[in-house]
Amino acid sequence: MRVFLDWFNEPADSAALDGLLRAGLSHLWFETIHPFADGNGRIGRAILDMAISQDAKSASRLHGLSIQILTAKTEYYAALNGAQRGAGDVTEWLAWFTNTFAESCETSLRLIDEALVRTRFWSANKDIALNPRQRKALIRMLAAGAGKFDGGMTPRKYMALTKANNRLTANRDLSDLVEKQLLVRGGAGRSTYYNLALPGWGWVPRGSRTT
C-alpha cells in the first residue's frame, strides 16, 4: 500500500503516462491490494475521480464514470479480474476502462442536452394554461428522457399518475394538450398513445419507423 501511495502522490505532471491511463492503473492497483474489509469499491471509484480531476486540473466532474461503472458491473468485474489474474498485461483492462470513460462522457452529454431541452420546453410554453394534472404528466414524461417514456402516455397511465377521476377527464386533458401542441397523438382506438411534441423524444412502437 505504501508503494501505491508513493506512486499515486507523485505530481501527476511528472508521470510519463497519459492521465487517463494513470487513473485506470490507480483503480486497478488499489482494487488489487483490497486493503479494507469493506468499502474498497467506493474508495477505488473515488481514487478514479481524483486521478481524472488531477489530469484535467479541475474539481468539476462531467463524466459520470462511477455511475457508468455501476451500471456495467458484470463487464467491470470481468475486466478487473482478468487483469488481476493475468501475467501483468493490463491492456484489456485499460481498453475497457477508456471505452467506459468515453461512454460515460457521452451519457453525461446526453443528460445535459436533455436538461436543456426540458428547460427550453417550459420556457417556450410558460404562458400556456395547464391544470395540475396536465403539468404533472408533462413533468413525468420529460423526466423519463428522450424516447424513454415506454408505451407513451395513455389514458390509463394518465389516470394512475394524476388521479384523474375518470377516463373522460383523462381523454379531455390529453386532447387539450394535443390542441396546445404539447403532445402528439399516435396509434388509434385502444392502442392510442401520446408523445411529447419534441423531435426525437417520442416513444416509437417496436417495428415502426421513426419519423
Regions found by a protein language model. Give the residues of each.
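Short alpha-helical segments that sit at the start of domains
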Residues: 112-144
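Short acidic, hydrophobic short linear motifs in intrinsically disordered regions
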Residues: 147-161
